[in-house]
A protein has these predicted regions:
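Short, conserved acidic/polar surface loops in the N-terminal third of protein domains
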Residues: 104-110, 130-132, 158-162
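Conserved "HGTGT" condensation-loop signature of ketosynthase/thiolase-family condensing enzymes
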Residues: 6-119, 184-257
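Glycine-/small-residue-rich "gating" segment that lines the acyl/pantetheine channel
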Residues: 21, 129-130, 160-196
Length: 257
């Protein structure tokens, strides 16, 4: 009887957190305890340049190929994260991480040395949002005290994977988007910090049939619009409720769409 009562209680708590069709609103706040960000030379020249923890001027990061370079970006990010964070590596229960490459090779080789249980994620440009969402759910449910959420990309490895290797010398049209060379990582936990994850809204696969592999902004814009609309509907808010609504870089074309 006690077990049944506990199950009923747990179901009630879960039901209370399920909001609308696509959202969860956590009963207890989950916090971003610390962050680390590594970027390439081109990224450092942009408006966010002064905010990056580490800037890697050598696109090869001292390695022999682009994939190894991306793995190095991940290692630099995790090392900087552990340096900044008050906790210890042994306190980390899981890593939720991913990249843009087949078989997540940058992540698999990049994070192997840390010997932390890892969930490999492939969500393309949504990977970091996916990592934050799953990390927050895991911590809130009590399955971990501290979790790393991480995602990386590299312009050259992504071009090789999805379009044309740089050595091919393909011409890029004006609407083409430029994949970031960098890595972002965060520790998610219950220790109170400046930023909390109050809830999440998970997007759906939205395909408007865009065929141009050079114009990722136009491809992603409908999905971004759909999940923003879902969040506003589920949470019963309007756009004025938020200080900022931030997406990945959709480019001028994607932003207009």
């Amino acid at each position: 009887a006690c077990v049944l009562c506990n199950r009923v209680k747990m179901k009630g708590e879960v039901d209370a957190m399920i909001v609308g069709k696509q959202s969860i609103l956590f009963e207890e706040n989950v916090y971003i305890e610390e962050t680390a960000c590594v970027a390439g030379q081109k990224e450092s020249e942009g408006p966010l340049g002064k905010l990056f923890d580490v800037v890697v001027e050598d696109a090869m990061a001292g390695m022999e190929n682009w994939e190894e370079a991306e793995s190095t970006l991940q290692q630099l990010a995790v090392d900087k994260l552990l340096e900044k964070w008050d906790g210890k590596k042994e306190d980390l229960r899981y890593i939720f991480a991913g990249d843009l490459l087949g078989q997540l090779i940058a992540t698999s080789f990049g994070l192997m040395q840390y010997e932390i249980p890892m969930f490999g994620l492939y969500g393309a440009c949504s990977t970091f949002g996916e990592a934050l969402s799953l990390a927050a759910m895991t911590v809130h449910a009590g399955y971990a005290g501290h979790v790393i959420a991480l995602a990386s990309s590299h312009f050259a490895s992504a071009e090789k994977q999805f379009r044309y290797p740089l050595e091919y010398g393909n011409q890029r049209p004006p609407a083409s988007t430029w994949t970031v060379t960098g890595c972002g990582a965060a520790v998610i936990g219950t220790e109170k910090g400046e930023v909390c994850i109050r809830g999440i809204t998970t997007g759906k696969v939205i395909d408007f049939g865009v065929k141009d592999s050079m114009n990722m902004g136009a491809c992603m814009a409908p999905a971004a619009a759909d999940v923003i609309a879902a969040n506003l509907e589920d949470m019963q808010k309007d756009v004025t409720y938020y200080d900022c609504i931030i997406t990945g870089d959709l480019g001028a074309v994607g932003k207009t769409i």
